[in-house]
Amino acid sequence: MKLCGFEVGLNQPLFLIAGPCVIESLQLQLDTAGVLKEITSKLGLNFIFKSSFDKANRTSGSSFRGPGLEEGLKVLEAVKTQIGVPVLTDVHEYTPIDEVATVVDVLQTPAFLVRQTDFIRNVCAVGKPVNIKKGQFLSPWDMKPVVEKAKSTGNSQILVCERGASFGYNNLVSDMRSLAVMRETGCPVVFDATHSVQLPGAQGGRSGGQREFVPVLARAAVAVGISGLFAETHPDPPNALSDGPNAWPLHTMAMLLETLVELDAVTKKRGFLEQD
């Protein structure tokens, strides 16, 4: 499958979707995107910048949600033109999807909305590549009918993204078998290494996270075999305005990606026995 001008799949090198969880300021987005572009260019890693203009599912009603649609799209367009990278953002049921699609290169559907049939179809009908996040409450094989809904619009540029499964209260677990199961959708599989270590609502009015396990799960997923890695990053995670506890520090992103690129090459060199 071609995505933003490059090929993705198990027979292609790993690609990266990364950026701050939410748009905090124009300068933060430009600086972060610039650092990520420099790192990925050195590694020969295809890169899509990600950030949200509205976080609609915050734990607390008083938490920062983002700058909103109008200002958010201006920031994403600035990143796209000034840094020279494709951009991704998530949309919601109330979002004017056509307007967002005039700026961004990839649309993303939130995990909590994965079962909303009309929403999935409406997003995919725009014709842009779509990254569909698997709900924390959904089994990996249940992504097959979701993809069928998506592709019924005539859009074949569909990615499926694993971001962990609910494991009791305030916890997520990553079953690496799901990455192989989700390949059966016929779509490139992306692993979200940062939301997978989230502890939803675990800090009372906000979610916690265990960012120390981001490289652990990222290495495991790449060793299983994935098309892309999703990782939210921030120059100062403790002071990030959204999902700081599970954001990977920007200053150590290069070291993490160097390891993953090497591991990806080894994993894909001989193919996958489970597909024989």
From Swiss-Prot:
Its EC number is 2.5.1.55. GO terms for biological process: keto-3-deoxy-D-manno-octulosonic acid biosynthetic process. GO terms for cellular component: cytoplasm. InterPro entries: Aldolase_TIM, DAHP1/KDSA, KDO8P_synthase. It catalyses: D-arabinose 5-phosphate + phosphoenolpyruvate + H2O = 3-deoxy-alpha-D-manno-2-octulosonate-8-phosphate + phosphate. Its main location: cytoplasm. The keyword Cytoplasm applies. It comes from the Bacteria. Pathway: Carbohydrate biosynthesis; 3-deoxy-D-manno-octulosonate biosynthesis; 3-deoxy-D-manno-octulosonate from D-ribulose 5-phosphate: step 2/3; Bacterial outer membrane biogenesis; lipopolysaccharide biosynthesis. GO terms for molecular function: 3-deoxy-8-phosphooctulonate synthase activity. The keyword Repeat does not apply. It is found in: Cytoplasm. Keywords: Cytoplasm, Lipopolysaccharide biosynthesis, Transferase. Belongs to the KdsA family. This is 2-dehydro-3-deoxyphosphooctonate aldolase.
